[in-house]
Regions:
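Non-catalytic, solvent-exposed segments at the cell envelope interface
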Residues: 2, 11-13, 23-340
């Protein structure tokens, strides 16, 4: 092959690579821009801030904070029949998915902190039933996980989950949300090179790859087994699983911080986009990701309360007084201070 042909082939290869990269970028951006109203920043005016009366004083939401709700989505066939029956009674639009885990990220840019509040999926709260056009057609009291079940499993289900969490947290407004199917756990886990955890639960009925009392480097589907398993471990409560998810999240965060900042967020968005739904644009997600990595991360324990077995499924009832105090401490400030 002569030199001219080699140069021509080289130019063609370069052009092809650039075109492929551009197509990938357009795919990611296009995926988010097709959503109804992607946003780039919180848009909460002072007049719209919720007020909360607690212990003889008025509080208002701290608008200097930015909040992001993340929900991991999975299918729950055992609860599907009951959900379908209720959906039929309400003439609601429902899907086959529920929230497997939920956590609220609270970013304080002034203090350079990111506080993570896990929420128990079994928490009993007010849930909106949605019609075919995404409109509210009624409400009922049910597990927080069910908020995602009402809607198309797309952006309408995401907003419905945001509303349910907001109602649970005494009207606190939530700026953004991301819902991600649980299949993405293995993808993200391997993107950071795996995550090492100390296995404290007995997984012997599930796998011999998670020996109790030993450190294990999680890769692939083993990471999903670690964060999702509940019924076949010794302690089958969701509270126990949430403690395990907290351990994993803290280890994952350290791995994320070790990734090259210039390229990793774009790569992660590209790999995870088939699993994600969000109200944010791709640019906003990248910005949020960097803000989280630049912050000091604190993962709280989930709100305290009581887990009881309902007629068919577990129900969690938070301690109202402790939850009110927690919400005030995390999200609200005295009304006088906000006016000053």
């Amino acid at each position: 092959m002569n030199g001219k042909k080699k140069k021509a082939l080289l130019r063609a290869a370069v052009i092809l690579c650039v075109a492929a990269a551009a197509a990938a970028a357009l795919f990611v951006v296009g995926k988010w821009e097709k959503m109804e109203t992607p946003v780039d920043a919180a848009d909460t005016s002072d007049d719209d801030r919720p007020e909360f009366y607690y212990a003889g004083a008025w509080y208002t939401q701290n608008t200097e904070l930015e909040t992001l709700l993340i929900a991991g989505i999975d299918k729950y066939s055992d609860q599907l029949a009951e959900t379908l029956e209720l959906g039929k009674e309400l003439d609601a639009n429902i899907n086959t998915q529920q929230s497997d885990f939920l956590m609220l990220l609270i970013l304080d840019k002034a203090q350079n902190t990111c506080t993570v509040l896990p929420l128990n999926r079994d928490t009993m709260t007010q849930i909106n039933a949605l019609g075919m056009a995404g409109e509210s057609i009624g409400s009922f009291t049910g597990q927080l996980a069910l908020a995602h079940t009402y809607g198309s499993s797309g952006i309408d289900s995401g907003y419905n989950t945001v509303q349910a969490v907001s109602d649970l947290l005494y009207g606190a407004q939530i700026d953004h949300f991301i819902t991600v199917t649980m299949d993405a756990v293995a993808v993200l886990n391997d993107l950071v090179g795996g995550v090492t955890v100390l296995v404290e639960d007995d997984f012997s009925n599930i796998t011999d790859q998670l020996p109790q009392g030993q450190e294990v480097h999680l890769t692939g589907s083993l990471a999903l087994t670690y964060v999702r398993s509940r019924r076949s471990v010794a302690d089958q409560t969701n509270i126990n699983r949430m403690a395990r998810q907290k351990t994993y999240l803290e280890a994952l965060y350290e791995q994320l911080k070790a990734q090259p900042a210039e390229t990793f967020s774009a790569k992660a968005l590209l790999e995870l986009s088939p699993y994600l739904v969000s109200d944010c644009s791709a640019a906003a997600l990248s910005e949020l990701y960097q803000e989280i990595l630049d912050s000091k991360l604190t993962v709280l324990d989930a709100p305290e309360g009581e887990s009881v077995r309902g007629e068919k499924f577990m129900e969690f009832y938070p301690d109202e007084q402790k939850l009110q105090r927690l919400v005030i401490d995390l999200l609200f400030i005295p009304a006088e201070a906000s006016a000053g």
